[in-house]
From Swiss-Prot:
The organism's taxonomic lineage, starting at the top: Bacteria, Pseudomonadati, Pseudomonadota, Alphaproteobacteria, Rhodobacterales
InterPro entries assigned to the protein according to its UniProt record, in alphabetical order: Mo/tungstate-bd_C_term_dom, ModE, ModE-bd_N, Molybdate_resp_trans_reg, Mop_domain, Transp-assoc_OB_typ1, Tscrpt_reg_HTH_LysR, WH-like_DNA-bd_sf
Protein name: Molybdenum-pterin-binding protein MopA
Family the UniProt entry places it in: Belongs to the ModE family.
Listed NCBIfam families: ModE_repress, Mop
Organism this protein belongs to: Rhodobacter capsulatus (Rhodopseudomonas capsulata)
Record keyword Cytoplasm present: no
Gene name of the encoded protein: mopA
GO terms, biological process: molybdate ion transport
PANTHER family given in the database record: DNA-BINDING TRANSCRIPTIONAL DUAL REGULATOR MODE, TRANSCRIPTIONAL REGULATOR MODE
């Protein structure tokens, strides 16, 4: 008989979106204590960049921002956990307590088959997609094969996705329905400033460069869209230099409607 106790590992996830687990809740709690992402990152054992990226993912995942922060490098930049973030921390704690009680009952005499447990753990599966944006459908135009779906992201920002007509029908897409828009960072093109001129990509999100991370070949750019929303692009290092992209510089993210994948909660 296995004497090792069951350990609860609570994870919350909407379909197609990154999970929110105890590690992210601990990060939120640390931000609330320290008032900076850098201090919180040190406490929970993350790099500053990983913690900053996690905050961006959380803010994109929820309707209201969980953290309001200003980039300030590894030693600066204030951060504040919002009321929505505090509510998530409290709610997650209640769920963890309930799960612990349920596990106590499970250990009392019920032995779940290994395959059943594996099925449960699969619910916490992560996605490699870099950009997951919570949106609201504003219009659906159905065609014979494809459907054009218009989405509201934030005040002043909207997206368009082109998916199959069958997918739009099966998902029940209609104005007011909440969805998640998934866009690979490598699909996002960047233009300096707010007017990219004539281009066929119908999705144009203008913001301010919040962070730049250079690699030997590629550069990751995080664009602040306002209202604590952001989008990430991976472009060549040469292109980033040619465009003069640096924190504080305005830029526009461009991507095709066909590169937007939609997922529902």
């Amino acid at each position: 008989m296995n004497e090792q106790p069951l350990i609860a590992a609570l994870s919350l996830q909407r379909a197609g979106a990154p999970r929110v687990g105890g590690d992210r809740i601990r990060l939120l709690e640390a931000i609330a204590r320290h008032g900076t992402i850098a201090g919180a990152a040190r406490e929970v054992g993350l790099s500053y960049k990983t913690a900053w990226d996690a905050v961006g993912t959380l803010n994109n995942l929820f309707e209201q921002p969980l953290v309001e922060a200003a980039p300030g490098g590894r030693t600066g930049g204030n951060a504040r956990v919002t009321e929505a973030g505090q509510a998530l921390i409290a709610g997650f704690g209640l769920l963890e307590g309930a799960l612990t009680k349920a596990l106590g009952v499970l250990e009392g005499g019920v032995s779940a088959p290994e395959k059943a447990l594996n099925t449960l753990w699969s619910l916490t599966m992560r996605t490699s997609n870099r950009n997951t944006l919570r949106c609201t459908v504003t219009r659906v135009t159905l065609g014979a094969v494809n459907a054009e779906v218009e989405l509201a992201l934030t005040d002043g920002h909207s997206l368009t996705a082109v998916i199959t007509e069958r997918s739009a029908t099966e998902m029940g897409l209609a104005p007011g329905v909440e969805v998640f828009a998934l866009i690979k960072a490598s699909f996002v093109m960047l233009a300096a400033g707010g007017d990219p001129g004539r281009i066929s990509a119908c999705n144009r999100l203008t913001g301010i460069v919040a962070a730049r991370t250079d690699g030997p070949v590629n550069t990751e750019i995080i664009l602040d869209l306002g209202n604590c929303k952001s989008i990430t692009a991976v472009i060549t290092h040469t292109s980033a230099d040619a465009l003069g992209l640096a924190p504080g510089v305005p830029a526009t993210a461009l991507f095709k409607a066909s590169h937007v994948i939609l997922a529902m909660p």
